[in-house]
C-alpha cells in the first residue's frame, strides 16, 4: 500500500470487526509501523489483556455483544493510550457516530504524539462535541467515565482543569462509586458463569457426571433466560443476553451431546 499510494508513514492505521479486529491487532503487534487500531467487537488475537502496546487502540462493543466483557477487560488492563466506546446493540459494527468518534480520537492522538500539527480549531470543535455528549448522559455514573476520557484525550491540547475538577468530585460521590462497583460485580459474575458452564460442558463427556451436569446447565440457562427476557433494561439483562449468545455460539464445536444442543437451541436468542 505504501508503495502504491502516497501515505504518511507515521500514520498507518488498521481496523477490523470481530475476527478482522484480531487480525488487525496481530499485525500491529508484529510490527512497529502501525500507529493505531480501531478494534470492533474483539481485541487481541489470543484475547489476553496487555498492560501496554506500542500503538493507540480505539475499541468498540455493543451492550449485548458476546465479546463485550473481553473489550471491557482490555480497557481496564491497558495503560497506553486507548479508548473504549460502548453502544446499544450486539456483535456488530459500530453505528456511524461511534465510527466517526474513533477517527476523531485518532486525530487527537496524532496531535498529541506530534504525528500531525496541532489544529486548535479542530481541537475546540471536538471539545465542544465531547462536552455535548457528556451533558446528554442521564446518570452521574455514566458521566464520570466520559469526563475522565475527555481529560485524558485533551490534556496537552487545551485547558482541561474544569473537567478534571468535576471528574474528581464525581469520583468521590458515594452513589457513583456504588454504581461503578455494581458494574464490576456484574462483570465478575458474568465471567464466573461462563467458566462454570464450560466446566459443566466438559462434564457432559463423563458418564458419571453427565446427568448432573446437564441438570445444572439447564438450571443456569433457565435463570439466564429469565433475566435476558426481563421487560426492563438493566446491567443484569445485558449480561444474561451476552452469556446466552456466548454459550450458544459454536456450541456444536465444543460438544456433541444432542440433549444439550437441543437445550441450547431452546434458549438461543434472536439477533
Regions found by a protein language model. Give the residues of each.
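A conserved short beta-strand
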Residues: 32-45, 55-56
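Short solvent-exposed coil/turn linkers within tandem alpha-helical repeat scaffolds
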Residues: 89-93, 150-166, 170, 207-215, ...
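Short beta-strand/loop motif that positions the catalytic acidic residue
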Residues: 58-61
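Gly/Ser-rich "nucleophile elbow"/oxyanion-hole loop immediately N-terminal to the catalytic nucleophile
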Residues: 1-18
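Acidic catalytic loop of the alpha/beta-hydrolase fold
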Residues: 63-69, 92
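C-terminal catalytic histidine-bearing segment of alpha/beta-hydrolase fold enzymes
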Residues: 72-75, 79-144, 148-149, 161-171
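Alpha-helical linker/edge segments of TPR/alpha-solenoid repeat scaffolds
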Residues: 112, 167-195
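Short glycine-enriched nucleophile-adjacent loop
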Residues: 21-32, 37
Amino acid at each position: 500500500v505504501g508503495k502504491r499510494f502516497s501515505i504518511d508513514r507515521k500514520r498507518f492505521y488498521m481496523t477490523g470487526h470481530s475476527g478482522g479486529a484480531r487480525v488487525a491487532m496481530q499485525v500491529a503487534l508484529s510490527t512497529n509501523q502501525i500507529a493505531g487500531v480501531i478494534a470492533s467487537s474483539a481485541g487481541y488475537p489470543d484475547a489476553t489483556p496487555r498492560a501496554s502496546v506500542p500503538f493507540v487502540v480505539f475499541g468498540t462493543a455493543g451492550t449485548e455483544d458476546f465479546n463485550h466483557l473481553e473489550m471491557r477487560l482490555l480497557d481496564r488492563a491497558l495503560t497506553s493510550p486507548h479508548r473504549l466506546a460502548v453502544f446499544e446493540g450486539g456483535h456488530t459494527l459500530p453505528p456511524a457516530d461511534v465510527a466517526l468518534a474513533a477517527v476523531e480520537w485518532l486525530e487527537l492522538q496524532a496531535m498529541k504524539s506530534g504525528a500531525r500539527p496541532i489544529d486548535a480549531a479542530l481541537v475546540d470543535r471536538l471539545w465542544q462535541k465531547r462536552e455535548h455528549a457528556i451533558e446528554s448522559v442521564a446518570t452521574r455514573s455514566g458521566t464520570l467515565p466520559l469526563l475522565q476520557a475527555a481529560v485524558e484525550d485533551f490534556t496537552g491540547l487545551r485547558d482541561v482543569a474544569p473537567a478534571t475538577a468535576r471528574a474528581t468530585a464525581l469520583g468521590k460521590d458515594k452513589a457513583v462509586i456504588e454504581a461503578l462497583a455494581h458494574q464490576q460485580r456484574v462483570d465478575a459474575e458474568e465471567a464466573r458463569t461462563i467458566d462454570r458452564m464450560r466446566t459443566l460442558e466438559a462434564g457432559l463427556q463423563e458418564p458419571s457426571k453427565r446427568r448432573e451436569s446437564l441438570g445444572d446447565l439447564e438450571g443456569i440457562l433457565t435463570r439466564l433466560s429469565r433475566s435476558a427476557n426481563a421487560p426492563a433494561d438493566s446491567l443484569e439483562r445485558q449480561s444474561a443476553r451476552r452469556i446466552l449468545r456466548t454459550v450458544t455460539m459454536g456450541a456444536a464445536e465444543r460438544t456433541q451431546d444432542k440433549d444439550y444442543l437441543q437445550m441450547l437451541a431452546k434458549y438461543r436468542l434472536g439477533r
